[in-house]
Swiss-Prot record:
Pfam families: AIG1. PANTHER family: GTP-BINDING PROTEIN A, GTPASE, IMAP FAMILY MEMBER-RELATED. One of its GO terms (biological process) is negative regulation of defense response to bacterium. Residues 188-190 are annotated as: G5. Residues 276-342 form a coiled coil. Residues 58-62 are annotated as: G2. One of its GO terms (molecular function) is GTP binding. It comes from Arabidopsis thaliana (Mouse-ear cress). This is Immune-associated nucleotide-binding protein 9. Gene3D superfamilies: P-loop containing nucleotide triphosphate hydrolases. Mainly expressed in leaves. Induction: Up-regulated by brassinolides. Down-regulated by 2-aminoethoxyvinylglycine (AVG), high CO(2), isoxaben, and propiconazole treatments. Residues 149-152 are annotated as: G4. The keyword Nucleotide-binding applies.
Length: 342
């Protein structure tokens, strides 16, 4: 499948839609496979728009976008993504999906929703932040909101999110919460209580509004967004010009369109390759960093074991010395007793 088949026409249509009827808020769900991104998207939309199942193997295979119109007429555009930042995911797949995600976000991202599950927080999830910053720069942190799924499990345990995080909050998660000003919300995607459903969505949208206000109403956008938008507009304009050509046969018109599509596809390939290069460099750096951290951890464990062994040896030696001293004391007392009797 070519890049054009993957997203060419889709991008053109999206950018054209964005110019005439821009969704007020665009939210992008990212996170590890199986964390509940699709279920969270469905909760936000108020309907089952994305495929979702309770399993650690994700069912989302490509970026998707769905919209909901609120009572006040505002439009919420929700973009669901597969596990883009798992270290095991191929860079070429991620590159294509990043380009697709950007196109679905249309003219910018109002909030990045980092989805974590309270059921399984793993150290490898620290890569999400590194990948996001490598692709979009440190400014992306200003648009991040942390969403925890598994609210049903905490309710069963009669535990609040604050209590859960007080007991278990890895360093990487503390860092993420710190750089996004502790913007976090808990979702129970299994509840059938309409009031609870509405409350958690409203809390999230309130956080989105705070992000929008903090960023002066401007959605996140960078060179990738601008370049993709320019290429899509160029493609649309060129096709319109071809439609207006006179004195050419239908076959010739079709050939012109084909050449335009091929040119657009080449530009998409170039942009995607640029994204893939960034991803590979980041993955290589992260793997090296994780390797160094693991080596340092093993070295620390080795030293701790050595200290413990040394301490055990010293304690054993002290005990032996004490026992010998006690024995010598008893022998001395025995000798003294004999001397007194004499």
């Amino acid at each position: 499948m070519s890049l054009l088949d993957m997203g060419g026409d889709m991008m053109e249509d999206d950018w054209e839609f964005a110019s005439s009827s821009n969704p007020k808020r665009t939210l992008v769900l990212v996170g590890r496979t199986g964390n509940g991104k699709s279920a969270t998207g469905n909760s936000i939309l108020g309907r089952k728009a994305f495929r979702s199942r309770a399993r650690t193997v994700g069912v989302t295979s490509t970026c998707e976008s769905q919209r909901v119109v609120q009572e006040d007429g505002d439009i919420i555009n929700v973009v669901d993504t597969p596990g883009l930042f798992d270290l095991s995911t191929a860079a070429d797949f991620i590159g294509k999906e990043i380009v697709r995600c950007i196109s679905l976000a249309e003219d910018g991202i109002h909030a990045i929703l980092l989805v974590f599950s309270v059921r399984r927080l793993a150290e490898e999830e620290q890569t999400v932040l590194s990948f996001l910053q490598a692709l979009f720069g440190s400014k992306i942190a200003d648009y991040m909101i942390v969403v925890f799924t598994g609210g049903d499990e905490l309710e069963e345990n009669e535990e609040t999110l604050e209590e859960y995080l007080a007991d278990y909050c890895p360093e990487f998660l503390k860092e993420i919460l710190g750089i996004c000003d502790n913007r976090l919300v808990l979702f129970n995607n299994k509840t059938t209580d309409k009031v609870k459903k509405a409350e958690q969505v409203q809390k999230l949208l309130s956080l989105v509004e705070s992000v929008v206000k903090q960023n002066n109403g401007k959605p996140y956008s960078d060179e990738l967004f601008h370049e993709l938008q320019e290429e899509a507009i160029k493609l649309r304009d060129q096709k319109k010009e071809v439609e207006l050509l006179q004195g050419y046969s239908n076959n010739e018109i079709d050939e012109f369109k084909k050449q335009i599509d091929m040119s657009y596809d080449r530009q998409l390939s170039r942009i995607t390759e640029m994204v893939e290069t960034k991803l590979r460099d980041t993955a290589k750096r992260l793997e090296q960093q994780l390797g160094e951290e693991q080596a340092a951890r093993l070295e620390a464990e080795k030293r701790a074991n050595e200290v413990q062994k040394r301490s055990s040896d010293e304690i054993k030696k002290l005990r032996e010395n004490l026992e010998r001293a006690e024995k010598e004391t008893k022998e001395l007392q025995k000798k003294l007793g004999k001397c007194i009797n004499l």
